[in-house]
Amino acid sequence: MKCFLRINRMALGETRTHTKFIVIVNILLGFGCLLLSLEKSYIDLLHADWMIFGYLLFAVGGIIGTMAVIGVFRDLNSIQYSDVQMSLPMSSAQRYFSKLLALFYLHIFPVLFWGGLTVVIKTIEKHNSEVYRFFWTTGDWDFFWYESVDWFRLYLCFAASVLFLDAVGVLCAVCCGRRAETGYFSYIAAYCLSVLPGLIRNRLLQTWGGQTMEAGHAFFVWTWSFWAKTYTDFPTYLLLINCGISIALMVLMYFVYRRRDAGTAGRPVSNRVFFEGVMFAAVLTMLSLNGSRYGILLTITGIAYLVIHIITFREQLSCRKIAVWLGKYAVTVLLVFLLNFAAYMTNGFGAVYYIPSESLDGAHVVVTTNRTTGSAVFYAGSGLAIYNERMEAYDGYVAPISMSDELKRDAIRIVQRHLAAQEKSFTDFFQRLGLIETEENWRHDLVNITVFQTKTGPDQEVMTQSLFLPYHEINAMAEELEDSGLVRAMEDLWYDSYAHQFHR
Amino acid sequence: MIEIANVTMEFRNKGVGGDGSTLTALRDISVTIPDGCVYGFLGSNGAGKSTLMRLLCGVYRLQKGTIKVDGRDVWNNASVKSEMFFVNDETVQYADFTLEGLRKYYRSYYETFSDEVFYRLAKQLQLPLNRKMSSFSKGMKRQAVVIVGLASMTKYLVLDEAFDGLDPAMRKMVKDIITDEMLDRGATLILSSHNIAEINELCDRALLIHKGELVFDGEIDKIRSCACKVQLMRKDSAITREELEKTGVDILKYSTMGSVAQVIVRGAGDEIMQKISAVPNDVCELIPLTLEEVFIYELEARGYGHEVLSEN
């Protein structure tokens, strides 16, 4: 307790030196709270559309947290501040944690306070509305509670976002030695960390696994705080874990901070591993954005890579240095390609075997083709069938006859095996990577397979997975399925009554 | 007491933005600073004075050697640092503070901080309490930081070029205030300055560093007497350097003007006179050196600013 009080006293001492920031952040968040709270309630001028400005002010209030981080950790950016702060009677642990506490007072607390106030006002306002009064009087507590929880989730999103940004800011502040680098590396790192898991999922697992996977929440647990609100099924507990990871990162960065002294103050980046890590993540992010315009992406990323090196190194430019940096970029791109190639060869690091990604219960696989000559496989919750283009008129699902889980798995394993058994070639790799895209070599023979999930999306829509197989592989798969007795020949299907298509 | 033993400090300019070079800022420095003294750090620009001060105050992490303050390590030691106050050679970091804000800031770190001393000294130096320090002159900023340092009531006060920017009258006043406040309570003052006269006047001990190496350290009087100037005259021909060196004296500088030879010799006066008397001469005169002359001749002997110093 005595130790905390001492750290708190130091944190308050640090906080007092950032009065301008305190005023600015509270003005932003205060007005954000006002706009969100008064929306369509008391003032006619504040139409619902104004709410976006409330969110915007909150977003700006959150983003400028990086400024607070830079200010609080200024002892790492300037030898003058190092002289003052590192000679003060504090151990490195006391200094670091007093800084974290100062960051809490400066930025995290205002976001939590104004966000909390907004949630309280909105909840009270909603509970006073006619609709709420109706449910209140009818005793429909579920509805009453649901809306309150929704605002609580929004509050947790504020908290998760601000903690995420500040944690990334602290990471960069501890690894950088100048204000500018701490600033722009914070935003680069925050962006990469936010989108990279999704891009890795899309590019490395989904594309090369030959399927679309259901959004795995655990996969995005830390970095999806910004988008969590848009996914109503993003569990609240994951938001709490999200906050926990950010706090843990801030605490763990102490072990890097304690190794630093004033000697590294003023160096653009004090930790080479950090610099190369961020640069690799940035290149990977950029090259995973859109596979169909790889040439443009390579050029834009290369220019950005070079510019960041010029800014960061602050050296006199020479042709040799630029050549070295371009060489480094080429190696980084090669690594990204190798990573993609590894994913291609392993079918998305084995992601192909997660079809369907959710439970088999009620899952059904539909294989269709828009080629007139194509045949197709239909796998329903209780069976599989092959049909051809003539069956496009067929709508709805056939009432399935019960099929055991074991048989479902057998059928799915055959689908997985054929997906994994696709012929590998560099041409195919580069084509699917997006480096080659011409009419001549476009894969005309790919057949789309759609796996319908039992699980429904945020708007109760049916969740699907899209798989692609070459035509000849589809035929082989259909034959194997038929041979195994899991499906019947399409001629039989066409003439059989629907009710008996999916026997067994 | 501060014991510095075999301290070596290297700056490796590695990593992002570094050119890979290594600069040895301090090489095998060993010094003892007794309690209650006023200790002066002398040295040329870039000699390593500020680096040594930063090591003393735990701003830099020690690489080789040891620094013990009352038997304890400084680095990462809050209790040792609570007995030290460091004023560096810049004031830009205080620009956003008011003097009152600076008081509150340091008060939250130093439990021994005395408001009474702070307000008394601020009044004495007529410094405005609620004006931003960015509007202060350089001298006023210096005074403000020194006041805070004194009010922190630490056992050790470390001042790096603390009197820079002060006019002569204010310089004297601040020096008087520092010596009164510090010596009254038996505290130790460590200061660096390029102004040797100032060190000569204020300090009872000093050290000289050049290019990271310790040239000498000890009591000022002893330093002054560790070298002296000898003027020799011989009517028929000037005494040559070789003749003098044969006597075994350590010559820092030798010059002639007609039949008069002037030599700066390292060592005690009596001993030097005894050795030099072996050389035939008509007149031999021993002239004590000032600290400034010792400083100049020692650095000159090491090739520092040779051309400039020779011209002067």
Where are these predicted regions, by residue range?
Chain B
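C-terminal coupling/interaction segments
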Residues: 259-312
